[in-house]
């Protein structure tokens, strides 16, 4: 299949308006939409076609509350690395949507999946984590195309999350994903607008 300019324009718009969302409306997400997101995530590339990502959908308010407590502790610990005005700025940043998002997913990487038969990862096992990252990004774009927002929470103690969710011992926690209708949309990252870190172009070096 060959694509045309309308396809390129649509993809660029989805990419431009994809944000790491922290502010969500409580509107529930239709199960048919969630099924579409799951199907698109499975279209992501992976090393050896191993599809090492594993996903737990967390609906329990009690589990979410424990993850939020985990976040609050990890955030406080991370905040000790900052001082002065930077510490004050850090305290104002909203770094999670656990308290609002209607759909929440814990994503893991299987450390040694049988699928793929080890192809492509013997010399670079990190490709399993890279595959999971690509699956998350694929889901992110699919969510945005559904007029949803996705926020990835990384300020967490991963081992505590693994214990809390009773994850198998060969699953490594990667990210907590919050998904829902965003309170607002923006074509500029929140951290750029907040003055924490502006968007900068990446130069491609040549050899």
From Swiss-Prot:
It catalyses: FMNH2 + O2 = dialurate + 5,6-dimethylbenzimidazole + D-erythrose 4-phosphate + H(+). It comes from the Bacteria. The keyword Oxidoreductase applies. FMN binds at residues 18-22, 46, 95, 154. GO terms for biological process: cobalamin biosynthetic process. InterPro entries: BluB, Nitroreductase, Nitroreductase-like, Nitroreductase/BluB. Involved in the biosynthesis of cobalamin (vitamin B12). Catalyzes the oxidative fragmentation and contraction of the isoalloxazine heterocycle and the cleavage of the ribityl tail of FMNH(2) to form 5,6-dimethylbenzimidazole (DMB) and D-erythrose 4-phosphate (E4P). NAD(P)H is only required initially to reduce FMN and oxygen drives the oxidative fragmentation. Belongs to the BluB family. PANTHER family: NAD(P)H NITROREDUCTASE RV3131-RELATED, NADPH NITROREDUCTASE. Homooctamer. This is 5,6-dimethylbenzimidazole synthase.
């Amino acid at each position: 299949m060959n694509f045309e300019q309308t396809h390129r324009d649509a993809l660029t718009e989805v990419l431009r308006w994809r944000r790491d969302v922290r502010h969500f409306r409580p509107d529930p997400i239709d199960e048919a939409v969630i099924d579409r997101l799951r199907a698109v995530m499975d279209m992501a590339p992976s090393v050896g076609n191993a599809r090492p990502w594993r996903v737990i959908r967390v609906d329990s308010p009690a589990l979410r509350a424990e993850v939020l407590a985990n976040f609050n502790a990890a955030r406080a610990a991370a905040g000790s690395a900052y001082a002065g005005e930077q510490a004050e700025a850090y305290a104002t940043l909203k770094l999670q949507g656990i308290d609002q998002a209607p759909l929440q997913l814990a994503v893991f990487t299987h450390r040694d999946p049988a699928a793929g038969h080890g192809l492509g990862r013997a010399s670079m096992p990190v490709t399993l984590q890279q595959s999971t990252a690509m699956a998350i990004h694929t889901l992110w774009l699919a969510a945005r195309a559904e007029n949803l927002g996705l926020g990835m929470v990384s300020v967490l103690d991963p081992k505590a999350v693994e214990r809390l969710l009773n994850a198998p011992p060969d699953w490594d926690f990667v990210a907590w994903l919050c998904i829902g209708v965003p309170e607002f949309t923006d074509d500029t990252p929140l951290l750029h607008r907040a003055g924490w870190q502006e968007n900068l172009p990446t130069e491609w070096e040549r050899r």
